[in-house]
C-alpha cells in the first residue's frame, strides 16, 4: 500500500527520484500513464494487469468506454528505476501533467501519483476546504 507525500525536483532529462518508501512496492518494472486531474498515475505491474483487464472488459459499443480506454492506455508507458532510484518520465506524460521543476509524489493506496507542485498545492487547498462535505457524501466508515 502506498501512502505519504514527497516533494522532489525533475532534472533536465525528465527524471525524478522515486521515494525509497515506494520503490519496493513498485518493483523493477511498472507502468506510468495519464491519470485523472492532470497528474500521472504509476502502477506496480500486478495492479496494472488487474486494471488493464477491467478496461479490456469495457463494452466496445459504448463511446465513453472506447474514449476512456484510448485515453488511459495510449498514454501508458512501461518504466523502470535506474540505479539512483529515478524514473525517467516520457515527455508526453510530463506535458500532460505540466511537470516543470518541482513535483509532488503521493501514495494513494494501490498507486503512486506524480503532480506538478503548483497543481497539487491548488488541488489540496480546494480539497481541504471541502473535505468535510466530501466525507459526508461518500464515506460511510465510522472513522
From Swiss-Prot:
One example of the protein's molecular function in GO is: transcription cis-regulatory region binding
Please state what the protein is called: Transcriptional regulator MraZ
Does the record bear Protease in its keywords?
A: no
Q: Which gene encodes it?
A: mraZ
| Gene3D superfamilies noted in UniProt | Transcriptional regulator MraZ domain (3.40.1550.20)
Q: Please, one GO biological process term? A: negative regulation of DNA-templated transcription initiation
What is stated as this protein's family in its record? Belongs to the MraZ family.
What superkingdom heads the lineage?
Answer: Bacteria
Q: Which InterPro entries match?
A: MraZ, MraZ_C, MraZ_dom, MraZ_N, MraZ_sf, SpoVT-AbrB_dom, SpoVT-AbrB_sf
- PANTHER family reported for this sequence: TRANSCRIPTIONAL REGULATOR MRAZ (PTHR34701:SF1)
Primary location recorded for the protein, binned into one broad class: cytoplasm
* Start and end residues of each SpoVT-AbrB domain: 5-47, 76-119
Assembly, per entry? Forms oligomers.
